[in-house]
Structures are given as structure tokens and as C-alpha cells.
């Protein structure tokens, strides 16, 4: 642990010397960027099926089967109606069982959340550099606050933009513009970090923000990668190194790998 902290301190000092004066803030997506939200959703789905299966030995216990209901787009990604549809289509619905499944869903999502390695330390180092940190998420304010509180990061961010605040979801530019307006910053003064090329990288880049693609959290890779982001993060800790390269005249972006290389 001491060795890791010493390495982080060394990186921070190097970044402090090279950080571009124009970079003033880092705007983070939340789910699958700070923590693996899909993993806890699947755990919650598994526990729901386990509960329902106690009275039906023939029920398939594949959590992906229930998870697919959340992906349909019929309701929101966290809407209980997805659980209700699943239960009704399998003739498992009762009001009592439904309430219990919703409680299981909320409980398991939160209690199993774990930050990706290095998130807490990296955020602390970014703040030491004087960078302002904010969240831009498609979750609503209630769920965003609950998750950030659970992992102990609620106070790490100066501002949070949620779907119920803007009335839209990414890739609508309103999320990014709302954050910039709240922070009083220009697009070129901010960096966006997110796991979705379509919803985070592409719209942010079109607005003129710098972009860092959190590939480690992208559970639905897309072919839409060409020129859609400035740098690829294979781990969250890679962010410190990228910020350190932004001011270097000897570093350029590899158009194929989107990683920084010396010419």
C-alpha cells in the first residue's frame, strides 16, 4: 500500500509540473466508470430469481434473463416495472412477492457496490492538483446520491448532473452544457471520463471537451470508435498519466489505439 501511494505521489508531482493551465475540471460518468454497476445489477437479478425460485423449482435461475428486461428501453434502466413484467409473464406475480423483489433489488445493488481499483486515491490526487470534479449521470438524483454515499464519494464531487435535473439523458448535450454552466467553464477547459462511446465520448467531443474513454467499464463495446475520443483508459489509474501528457508537445494521439505515443 505504501509503495502504491509513493507511486501515486510521484505521478502527481510530475502531473503538477505538466498539467495544462487550460484544464480546470474533470467531469465523470458514474456507473461503470467509478464502479461496476452491471455486476451489481446481475447480482440483484440473481437474488430476485433465487427468492422467486423457492416456490418454483422449474424456474430458470439465469440472472441475465431478468437483466434483459432492464435493457428493453420500455421503462427506465432502474424502473421496478421491469421486474413486474418479468414476474407477470411467468405468472409469478403477487403484490407481496413484487414488493419483496423490489426490496431485494435495491438492497443488493447498493450493498455489493465496489469502486474500481485506484478510484479513491486518483480522485484525491486530482483534487490536490486543483482540478474541479463533477458527476454527469443518466441516473436520477436519488439513486446517484445513494450510490455515491455507499462508496463514500459523495463529498468528492463539487457538482452532480442527473437525468431528472436536465429532463434528458446522454447523448443529449444538455447534460454536458448543464455541468459547464454550473461550473462556469468553457468546453476546452474540461475533460470528460466515461465508459460509453455513444453516450459520453462522441457528444462531449462534438462540444469541444477533451475525452478519456474508460474502456475497462464498457460492457457493450461498439464499432463506433474512430475519432470519438482522445485517450483510452485501460484502468482508472491511467487518468493521472493522461492528464500529465496533455501539455506535452512531444506527445500525440495514435488514431488507431487512441493511446499517447512519442513520435
State each model region's role.
Residues 1-26, 39, 120, 124-263:
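Asp-based, Mg2+/Mn2+-dependent phosphohydrolase catalytic module
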Residues 4-125, 142:
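N-terminal helical cap/lid subdomain that shapes the substrate entry/recognition surface
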